[in-house]
Amino acid sequence: MRTGVIAKKVGMTRLFQEDGRHVPVTVLSLENCQVVSVRTAERDGYVALQLGAGEAKQKNVAKPQREHFAKAEVPLKMEVAEFRVADDALLDVGSTIAASHFVPGQYVDITGQTQGKGFQGAMKRWGFGGMRATHGVSISHRAHGSTGNRQDPGRVFKNKKMAGHMGDRQRTQQNLEVVRTDDERGLIFVKGSVPGSKNAWLLVRDAVKVSRHAEAPYPAGLKQAANSNDSAAADTPAEVAAVEATEGQEG
């Protein structure tokens, strides 16, 4: 079992397939998603990875959390979450997970906080059909109908569908297809809609009801650190121009 990731919902758009069909997708962004801590069976009683994502200001982070991030030698994180993993899927603290952790064609489960709608009536909240506009209906056009009957049972049953607060609940959408990934920009394109509003933090995991994709990297798809020697060896355009000018003067 691999780790999931913490992603930010950017918004929705569409992608065109090779045959011309367009697919509505949700764009998810990985903002420096790093391993902050490791949970082991010997010390904690279970095996998991604690990940952090985003960049928080120091004034918005409590001192114990600042010490926690400093111990891991990672920047201050805006969002932190734990993912249960297998023993052979543990990662080093400080490892950065890339968008290549997921591959096109695989299915994922996405957990988020749905958009809050405030206090809503029974028709909008539960999809009730309502009553007729005229012909025998008085002030009950959008009412939910019977609530507690009469003397028997003389009470309102639990979970009765009535008007009340709608939305702002944690929900998980299962078996969403990954259409495309952009490793350079850290973007994941998922088919369809996902819970939450724009800029909301989401938890993205491998689908539990579908086998893991054969091409999905195990234990994780990590972002490779840039090699300083390679970058130093590469000539900049200014250096190339200077060499060419020098060669012209020698001639």
Swiss-Prot record:
One of its GO terms (biological process) is translation. GO terms for molecular function: rRNA binding; structural constituent of ribosome. Residues 221-251 are annotated as: Disordered. Keywords: Methylation, Ribonucleoprotein, Ribosomal protein, RNA-binding, rRNA-binding. Residues 225-251 have a biased composition (Low complexity). GO terms for cellular component: cytosolic large ribosomal subunit. The modification N5-methylglutamine is found at Q151. Methylated by PrmB. PROSITE patterns: RIBOSOMAL_L3. It comes from the Bacteria. Part of the 50S ribosomal subunit. Forms a cluster with proteins L14 and L19. One of the primary rRNA binding proteins, it binds directly near the 3'-end of the 23S rRNA, where it nucleates assembly of the 50S subunit. Belongs to the universal ribosomal protein uL3 family. This is Large ribosomal subunit protein uL3. It comes from Novosphingobium aromaticivorans (strain ATCC 700278 / DSM 12444 / CCUG 56034 / CIP 105152 / NBRC 16084 / F199). The gene is rplC.
